[in-house]
Amino acid sequence: MNSQGKTDEAFALAKVALQCDMKSHVCWHVYGLLYRAVKNFEEAIKAYKFALRLEPESAQIQRDLALLQIQMRDYQGYIISRRSMLQARSGLRQSWTALAVAHHLAGDLAEAERVLTAYEETLKNPPSKTDFENSEAVMYKNSLIAEQGNIEKALEHLTSAGKHNLDRLAVLELRATYLAKLERKEEAIKAYRALIDRNSEYKKYYDGLIEAMGLAATDHMARKAVYDEFAEKYPRCDAARRLPLDFLEGTYLIGPIYA
């Protein structure tokens, strides 16, 4: 009835059903669905919670409640829901990841990392090197470590857990970023040069290299020399020729590459 635009009649019928059986989790769940349909999310959450008290094992009600909680940014409530869903289906990696994300959204990065570590400790056999889901989980955990400000630990984790990661480019980019933040200058320079060798058209790599080299924004000639090097190394590279035009002016533009 609600899908046919008869919202008032649908609510009236749901209330009649509740009067007939106040302890029916199905009636309360449907009541919550009706409130969600009219975007009254607070009342929908109340109805879902009541339905869940009547039927704590209902995965569908728990899932609907969790979706509304995250939509309403009720992070603590979302954590409780995700923990319940994890206890019900602890064998699924997505249950652990979802709980970690809940803690992440609530601002508790350390607990989010702990949840992912706890899942790793439940594994009897190491994941396959071709397991894409595991690769993504490793990178997510690495981002949590880095967001906590522990760059040294993040680099160590990237080197160990990420060495077989399927997204090799992401690993190389993060490694260069971490080395630069740790002020390991020579290693950072080498890492960014390797990235430019992979893709000489990406501006971010040049920016990272110049920053790692410690070149001042006003040192136009030194910065130009970096671009000249790669313009000569990769004759068909447009970025190495174009990017210096963002800061060069006057006589600095004169030369074999820019003439």
For every predicted segment, state its role.
Residues 2, 29, 33-36, 63, ...:
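Position-specific recognition of the canonical hydrophobic site in helix A of tetratricopeptide repeat
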Residues 15-19, 49-53, 83-87, 121, ...:
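Conserved structural position within tetratricopeptide repeats
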Residues 22, 56, 90, 124, ...:
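Short coil turns that delineate tetratricopeptide repeat
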Residues 30, 64, 98, 140, ...:
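Canonical tetratricopeptide repeat
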